[in-house]
């Protein structure tokens, strides 16, 4: 039975731990927590790129989710944990890649949950993926809610399967009495995107005039500020053993390109590539690259195109009614992302791209 949160450290001055703080969602979450006056610890790997947390007033702990003992120092004395870290990818990859996905996402979550329970670190909010939420097999565009079970017998990506297994680890822990909540994230758009993310790269390439064509489809997109708010709501109001879906808006690719054009001043591409043709090209190129050049970035993967063609919608009524979640707009999220890539990363080099609008 779902219960209210009962953290073991009552002091409001006790820190919270954020894993994956150097990533897109993690960086946005850390900035928001610091703005709220929360004492923040971050768990990062020493070999990772950690530009996102440079200069921030956080306690740094170095560890690896695959090594349970390395997590304990960061967890001691915490009053809550945001487990955001994950290996995200839309490729099938080779055997080594699939093993890495499993060890980082599934085994890593299991280790984190066990170490948090043993350290009495309070509630753990785990970032879930909308890709691991089920859908109507006969009509995938029907809105999916938290009750819809992931169907593993359809063609799915290793990442999708791993996030479904991550949820299983959460429910196993909750069944043993641990305080765990899952905050489900959709396609993320916003600032503090240092790596950058797939959507961030697409926006930068668009602004730099490198996006020549597009594929039809659509997906649920979430603004960084909305998914961050969702995590905080899960920590403060969520029911243990439950998951909540957070999305800002469903948008077609054509609608996203309209927003890109408005924000950047660069005309959208007129050429539309048929999805079937793009799928054939993506299958062939992904097979070759995954086996012979696994580190080469792939923009249009078979998995990404398949997801876009499903045109999946999300039902966020549970988060809105139980937690008071109020989504903003994807237009604002694109503006936030563009401002970050233009002003902070200096990644927009096209002289025809207009400067971002100033806030306020």
Task: Report the location of each language-model feature.
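N-terminal Rossmann NAD(P)H-binding glycine-rich loop of SDR-like oxidoreductase domains
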Residues: 14-36
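NAD(P)H-binding glycine-rich loop region in Rossmannoid oxidoreductase-like domains
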Residues: 47-54, 58-107, 115
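Conserved catalytic-site region of short-chain dehydrogenase/reductase
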Residues: 90, 129-141, 188-192, 197
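A conserved pocket-lining segment of Rossmann-fold NAD(P)-dependent short-chain dehydrogenase/reductase
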Residues: 93, 150-154, 201-222, 226
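Conserved Rossmann-fold NAD(P)-dependent oxidoreductase catalytic core, especially the SDR/UDP-sugar
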Residues: 103-159
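Substrate-positioning beta->alpha
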Residues: 111, 165, 198, 215-235, ...
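Conserved beta-loop-beta element that borders a ligand/cofactor-binding pocket
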Residues: 128-129, 168-191
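Mid/C-terminal beta-alpha module of Rossmann-like enzyme folds, strongest
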Residues: 230-298, 316, 321, 331-360
């Amino acid at each position: 039975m779902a219960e209210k949160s009962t953290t073991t450290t009552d002091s409001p001055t006790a820190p919270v731990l954020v894993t994956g703080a150097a990533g897109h969602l993690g960086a946005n979450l850390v900035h928001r927590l610091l703005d709220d006056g929360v004492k923040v610890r971050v768990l990062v790997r020493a070999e990772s790129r950690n530009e996102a947390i440079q200069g921030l007033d956080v306690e740094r702990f170095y560890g690896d989710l695959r090594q349970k003992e390395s997590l304990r120092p960061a967890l001691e004395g915490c009053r809550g944990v945001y487990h955001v870290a994950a290996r995200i990818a839309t490729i099938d990859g080779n055997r080594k890649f699939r093993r890495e996905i499993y060890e980082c996402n599934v085994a890593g979550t299991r280790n984190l949950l066990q170490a948090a329970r043993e350290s009495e670190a309070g509630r753990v909010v785990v970032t879930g993926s909308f890709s691991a939420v089920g859908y109507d097999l006969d009509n995938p565009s029907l809105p999916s809610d938290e009750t819809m079970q992931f169907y593993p017998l359809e063609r799915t990506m290793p990442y999708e399967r791993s996030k479904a297994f991550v949820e299983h680890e959460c429910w196993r822990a909750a069944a043993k009495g641990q305080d765990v909540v899952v905050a489900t994230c959709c396609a993320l758009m916003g600032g503090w995107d240092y790596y950058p993310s797939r959507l961030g790269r697409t926006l930068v390439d668009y602004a730099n005039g490198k996006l020549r064509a597009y594929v039809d489809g659509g997906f649920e997109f979430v603004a960084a500020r909305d998914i961050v708010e969702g995590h905080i709501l899960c920590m403060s109001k969520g029911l243990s053993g439950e998951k909540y879906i957070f999305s800002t808006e469903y948008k077609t690719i054509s609608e996203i390109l309209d927003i890109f054009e408005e924000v950047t001043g660069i005309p959208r591409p007129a050429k539309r590539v048929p999805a079937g043709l793009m799928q054939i090209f993506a299958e062939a190129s992904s097979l070759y690259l995954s086996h012979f050049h696994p580190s080469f970035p792939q923009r249009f993967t078979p998995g990404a195109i398949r997801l876009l063609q499903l045109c999946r919608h999300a039902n966020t009524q549970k988060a809105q009614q139980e937690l008071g979640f109020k989504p903003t707009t994807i237009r604002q999220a694109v503006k936030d992302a563009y401002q970050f890539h233009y002003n902070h990363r200096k990644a927009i080099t096209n002289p025809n791209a207009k400067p971002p609008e100033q806030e306020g």
